[in-house]
Regions:
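Hydrophobic/basic alpha-helical segments
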Residues: 1-164
Length: 164
């Protein structure tokens, strides 16, 4: 099972996660199609057939693809806000200048959407999550520390609180 899991992580998962910051599925059916690949893989491993999907992921030390997409969006947002990408931040969103609000001082403002399609864009997906992050998570001085703070248990708990 360990060899198959490594093969899945090396060969299959990069195909499922290719360009997720640029395009991330927003429709439930599209999310399910991508997640179904990982569900089927974990279901076929010996000894895991009778476990639930989340139990299989935990026993294999894997995360759902949805959580991995959220993490990659947050990491890219961190890179944009702190100037680690050679990209004009104002093309995506505006960093608020008002630092008197609750939470961290790097809050982002949503650009207005003229149609439903823009809600799938990176800037719309990430802003609500980014603005809700606690100060201690956003204020890390290095990207590595920020990445370490985004553990799967933290993201699961965070998503349950803010998005359910």
């Amino acid at each position: 099972a360990i060899t198959l899991t490594r093969a899945f992580i090396v060969y299959v998962r990069p195909l499922l996660e290719y360009s997720t910051v640029v395009w991330s599925p927003s429709l439930v059916r599209d999310i399910d199609i991508l997640e179904k690949v990982q569900r089927r893989f974990t279901k076929r491993l010996p000894g895991l057939q009778n476990l639930t999907y989340h139990q299989r992921l935990a026993s294999l030390n894997l995360e759902s693809l949805e959580l991995r997409r959220l993490r990659s969006d947050l990491i890219f947002a961190y890179k944009l806000v702190f100037g680690l990408q050679n990209v004009n931040v104002s093309d995506f969103f505006e960093v608020r200048t008002n630092t008197r609000s609750r939470g961290h001082p790097y809050k982002l403002d949503l650009p207005t959407a003229k149609n439903r399609t823009r809600f799938n864009f990176f800037s719309y997906r990430v802003i609500r999550v980014w603005n809700a992050l606690p100060t201690e998570t956003v204020n890390f001085s290095s990207l590595g520390c920020f990445k370490k703070s985004l553990t799967s248990t933290y993201l699961v708990r965070f998503c349950k609180v803010y998005f359910k």
